[in-house]
Amino acid sequence: MRDIKTYLSVAPVLTTLWFGALAGLLIEINRFFPDALAFPFF
């Protein structure tokens, strides 16, 4: 039971950190390469 409680307390923290890092990465990509729906360098 202790392992389940540890998992339930760690998983939300890790997903919050992961989605925060992913959102930051996407924001930085959009800052340096705006309008990425049209890739003009292909």
Swiss-Prot record:
Predominant localisation class: plastid
SUPFAM superfamilies: Subunit IX of photosystem I reaction centre, PsaJ
Keywords: Chloroplast, Membrane, Photosynthesis, Photosystem I, Plastid, Thylakoid, Transmembrane, Transmembrane helix
GO cellular component labels: chloroplast thylakoid membrane; photosystem I
Transmembrane intervals: 7-27
Gene3D superfamilies the record matches: Single helix bin
Membrane topology: Single-pass membrane protein
Coiled coil location: none
GO biological process, one term: photosynthesis
Pfam families in the record: PSI_PsaJ
InterPro entries cross-referenced by the UniProt entry: PSI_PsaJ, PSI_PsaJ_sf
Subcellular location: Plastid, Chloroplast thylakoid membrane
Reported function: May help in the organization of the PsaE and PsaF subunits.
Family that this chain belongs to: Belongs to the PsaJ family.
The name this protein goes by in its record: Photosystem I reaction center subunit IX
Originating species: Amborella trichopoda
